Amino acid sequence: NLLEGLRFYVSFACTFAFGELKLMEGSAKILSLIARDEATHLNLSTHVIKAWQKGDDKGMSKVMKGLDKTVIEMFKKCVEEEKAWAKHLFKDGSIIGLNERLLGTYVEWIANKRLRALGFDPLYDVGANQNPLPWTQHWLSSKGLQVAPQETEVESYLIGGIKQDVQKGQFKKFSL
């Protein structure tokens, strides 16, 4: 759940910020697809963990007993590592609309959201409706996504779909 739901979000936000500035848009779009794929994995792992918490799998429910402190510590460590990455990225300054402090708050906001989804209390003082980077949402959501044909690769073209049995001299009588 940490890997798909919290890790890399500093990097995602930075890449999306370039996309917002109309720089490196291709990279931002590709990372947007990767982030959406990670969201699918996140939904699956959240569903499985919640099923274990409910007791749907007695063996896994037994394993999970007493792991709450470990889960919380793992979230705290992940948040600190993401913040350290943000600090490294912005050691020489910020970019328009993004800096180390905003990214730190963003990571805390995401961590709280992920914790709530698993039935834990939030750890950080960032409200559920206080996304510090609301502009990232359209990069992370598939809603309203429409790709113009000229902006995507079409892979359905038939390649090699013509007969290539032309004989030497076949067009001798042909003139323009």
Protein language model regions, located:
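Non-heme di-metal
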Residues: 1-176
